[in-house]
Curated annotation (Swiss-Prot):
Pfam families reported for this sequence: TRIC
Transmembrane feature ranges: 19-39, 53-73, 86-106, 145-165, 179-199, 210-230, 235-255
Protein family membership: Belongs to the TMEM38 family.
Lumenal side stretches: 1-18, 74-85, 166-178, 231-234
Bias (Basic and acidic residues): 281-290
Keywords from the named record: Calcium, Ion channel, Ion transport, Membrane, Metal-binding, Nucleus, Potassium, Potassium channel, Potassium transport, Sarcoplasmic reticulum, Transmembrane, Transmembrane helix, Transport
Binding annotation for Ca(2+): 74
Protein name, entry field: Trimeric intracellular cation channel type A
Complexes and interactors: Homotrimer; conformation seems to be controled by binding to diacylglycerol (DAG).
Record gene name: TMEM38A
Subcellular location: Sarcoplasmic reticulum membrane; Nucleus membrane
Organism: Bos taurus
Length: 299
């Protein structure tokens, strides 16, 4: 009890927020990011036939969040590539995952208990990047709430918001896989986290930044580790969104029903024509019947 009272939550959170990310946590971030790249269809063949394109895709997976954040803030998009240590470390991870003999490195990091450790450490990096991105945006735009939220969001989402560009580098074009249309759990969590950190940065959330980093990191680590261990693609926010979204934005089925009724009312020729137009199937049957009559007359 004395130990628990001596080690308060504030001191623990402050110590946790001061833990350096390089090289251990950044290494885990690179491993998981490039591991997901190898899961993509055709990624292994691309690394054999076009290694430079594969390397560029790996760098996007590792540093795409920095590129997007610099683009939003009007800074050089290749600024982070001046960090030689991170580039060399990410390149070494890319080479080991794709070209290690007998896929030994890939098999080791894919082993589920080891992978869960890397996934947890990646979420530590994600939350820290959200907080740093919002602090950086606040330095340029003191009252730009939406700028801070957008910067923190892209910092946390990583390459997912650039998925279409990354697919083009692999020679794939799937516009239906746009992350904004179909948000995954990390993208949604990064958005909600960016809102929380923006409220804290602007003094609207009465909590210290270190405590918020610690609490949100524990939430992200718990959720992501559970989803990875159970091989689930669902989101913990689905239950909450199922209740809130119909209230705020209406249900999609109700809108479709109204649209169909509106189209059906315009389909008639007016109040004096209660019958709707014939469906396409009945028209085809009528045309087949007329053809049969013509053939009988010809016989």
């Amino acid at each position: 009890m004395e130990l628990l009272s001596a080690l308060s939550l504030g001191e623990l959170a402050l110590s946790f927020s001061r833990v350096p990310l390089f090289p251990v946590f950044d290494l885990s971030y690179f491993i998981v990011s490039i591991l997901y790249l190898k899961y993509e269809p055709g990624a292994v063949e691309l690394s054999r036939h076009h290694p430079m394109a594969s390397w560029l895709c790996a760098m996007l997976h590792c540093f795409g969040s920095y590129i997007l954040a610099d683009l939003l803030l009007g800074e050089p998009v290749i600024d982070y590539f001046s960090n030689n240590s991170s580039i060399l470390l990410a390149s070494a991870v890319w080479y080991l995952i794709f070209f290690c003999p007998l896929d030994l490195f890939y098999k080791c990091v894919c082993f589920l208990p080891v992978k869960l450790i890397f996934v947890a450490m990646k979420e530590v990096v994600r939350v820290r990047k959200i907080a740093v991105g919002i602090h950086h945006a606040h330095h340029h735009y003191h009252h730009g709430w939406f700028v801070m939220i957008a910067t923190g969001w892209v910092k946390g989402s990583g390459v997912t918001l650039m998925s279409n560009l990354e697919q083009l580098l692999r020679g794939v074009w799937k516009p239906e896989t746009n992350e904004i249309l179909h948000m995954s759990f990390p993208t949604k969590a990064s958005l909600y986290g960016a809102i929380l950190f923006t409220l804290q940065q602007t003094r609207w959330l009465p909590v210290s930044k270190a405590s918020l980093i610690f609490i949100f990191t524990m939430f992200m680590v718990s959720c992501k580790v559970f989803l990875t261990a159970t091989h689930s693609h669902s989101s913990p926010f689905d239950v909450l969104e199922a209740y809130i979204c119909p209230v705020l934005f209406g249900s999609a089925s109700g809108g479709d029903h109204h649209h169909n009724n509106h189209g059906g009312s315009q389909g008639g020729s007016g109040p004096g024509s209660p019958h709707s137009p014939l469906p396409s199937k009945s028209k085809e049957e009528l045309s087949e019947g007329s053809r049969k009559k013509k053939t009988k007359k010809a016989d």
